[in-house]
């Protein structure tokens, strides 16, 4: 992670507890829901990645992560109360060896790697300029500088402007962080929307 941070030298977003600190350093309160929330997304016409998180109801691992890089789905989630986090790529479980990166390729090009360090997982896509660190409690997101002003989601747009941080998916400007956060909840039949 240190290499990645020093390589890109830009801000990060983190989701911990019941709040998110955006790329532009605004704290956003999260609604009570077990639905996925859009944490960060490339909202440019390229739509290279989407990062989602949800509450699990598991006290030891209260969060699950789902991300899409290109069209590949990455999930880090507990499958039982005492399982620890499990990695699934496109629905298939991937067993990791501590400290040894799992490399996923598409069209003979490395799309991303996943490395486990004890209970901490690092997902890094160098071609797409995306880094995620996740341990089931906290999610750390960092993106390359070329995404500046092109992102949306709970992490904000990464445009260095704190004054206009609370822009929802329909480009509505919110004054309240909780209402802003509710706008990024993804309703589904298996969860309760706020």
Descriptions of predicted regions:
Residues 1-194:
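Extracellular/secreted glycoprotein ectodomains characterized by long, lumenal stretches
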